[in-house]
Amino acid sequence: MAMPPNGLMRLDGTGFGDAFRRREPAQFGHALQDHPLLTLDSIAQLADDLPRESVISDTADQALLVPEGGPPRGKLPRPGDVIRHLDENRSWLTLLNIEQLPAYAELMNQCLDEVEPFIADRRSDMLRRVGFVFVSSPNSTTPAHFDIEHSLIMQMQGEKRLTFGKFTTVQAERHEVVRYWDGSHGRIESLPPELAAYQLTPGIGVYIPPVTPHWVKNGDAISISVTLTFFTPDTNRETLIQAFNARMRRMHLSPHYPGDWPLVDRAKATAMRAYGLRRHLRGRNRAMSA
């Protein structure tokens, strides 16, 4: 499948589609490293333009295992200034939901529109698109964790080593997924055996499958990377079931894990869709009456 000559994603010949279907990591190329929206100065301005709650920051000197909770949001009054001096201040920052700004939404959608033919049967199969920017000081560490979305991480500046692990048992994976929904932010309790490692340099990207443990070590320069995430119908449905189960656990009940009882799963997903729709309509009604 040939991509247009002005495309931003370089997926041909990488085995990306097959790896996606197997939910295995895969390397690919991209042409974003020189994009004007993704320079250090542009990202510093982006950090200042985003709502404070969309900026996460922490020290660059992290342990590989930090199992309890995640870093704080919104604590920096001028995050752009921190980004401009990352070579001095030993920090890393995550800018969440960059699609809140129209220019970044357009760039995100251009990239994911190019990816979609490789992974989806129908255009509607790529759901809940979101973009993130990660900027960090030299030799920073990102603790071991996993995400529930399909993720495409792409390096813009500097380099870093991305290492994947593999849960040794189904029970270990389920334990960590339950912890995620109960507030662990995906940060895992023990380091799993190493599965694969990739060296990310500008122009290189890697597909990160859902619920795949990984950790990151930066090189000797400031690192900038972009991650684009999305759900497919099956992963979106599982999030609904897991969200329902989390609510049940808060009521001191013990729900079955997704997949154990398919008919019950269907009812849980339907209930959460209805709950989400009610919240959406309630929010619209409040906005209209304000």
Predicted regions and their residues:
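N-terminal accessory scaffold of Fe(II)-dependent oxygenases
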Residues: 1-156, 160-167, 172-176, 223-225, ...
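Double-stranded beta-helix
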Residues: 155-213
